[in-house]
Amino acid sequence: MKMATNGRFFTIGLVASWYSSNIGVLLLNKYLLSNYGFKYPIFLTMCHMTACSLLSYVAIAWLKMVPMQTIRSRVQFFKIAALSLVFCVSVVFGNISLRFLPVSFNQAIGATTPFFTAVFAYLMTRKKEAWLTYFTLVPVVTGVVIASGGEPSFHLFGFLMCIAATAARALKSVLQGILLSSEGEKLNSMNLLLYMAPIAVVLLLPATLIMEKNVVGITIALARDDFRIVWYLLFNSALAYLVNLTNFLVTNHTSALTLQVLGNAKGAVAVVVSILIFKNPVSVTGMLGYSLTVCGVILYSEAKKRNKN
């Protein structure tokens, strides 16, 4: 009985950490890029990936949280590098969109990931779902169209960046299923991050130097005036790793259905918290649109589950 209670408390603690890190990194990204005025999304993403590289190594090589899996061939390495590139694009574009859009609208667009996943799965693998499953994607897309029309802080460039980030996130999940499908090449998410994050740093470094010139000098100058920026960046980067760690642990300690429900609720919680903190204007139309999208995502998940059974 005591073991079961302890296990329940451990799972609740994990879920709370998962929610806190996910919502925390999202809100802090928004604060830094928009409110604080640190307008360097590529450099910010590079900080995240550097932290993920270092902390992944500590967690796997030193703390032995999961067994270390090795890359077995050059082909597997190039597959991971391709995934890393798509991963970079999704995170950078997502951070760019946060400069221009409120978190609430950003989350509404992000909820359309299943739509893009279904599209890419069909285009790349010819994998067809039941018609009912595709039908449930109609409210997902319709909701975002309605939310866009009713969004007081709508920004076209931010909207396009967010759509691109969402599409890239879906593309990564489909690509991962294709590229690392054989038993010999499968990596758990912790090991995949261990290899993807350093590749991401290598890809982001030239992009940062070319597109965000003298960002290191600007950050150092900024730190001289306000040292809090250093703590913000360090905490934000550590949170970015914690998102991946808690996501892995929650996936391992809960059922697929629980994870689905928690994932759908997480976006809604992020929306409410962001509105309370940033006090961005919201419209009834926008909230109705977002609600319709969330309902569509829940129906889509349910339809996919029934189709499997």
Swiss-Prot record:
The keyword Transmembrane helix applies. This is Probable sugar phosphate/phosphate translocator At5g05820. It is a multi-pass membrane protein. It comes from Arabidopsis thaliana. Pfam families: TPT (PF03151). The chain crosses the membrane at residues 9-29, 42-62, 77-97, 100-120, 130-150, 154-174, 192-212, 229-249, 256-278, 282-301. Its main location: membrane. It is found in: Membrane. InterPro entries: Sugar_P_trans_dom, TPT_transporter. PANTHER family: SOLUTE CARRIER FAMILY 35. Belongs to the TPT transporter family. TPT (TC 2.A.7.9) subfamily. Residues 30-147 form the EamA domain. GO terms for cellular component: Golgi apparatus; membrane. It comes from the Eukaryota. Keywords: Membrane, Sugar transport, Transmembrane, Transmembrane helix, Transport.
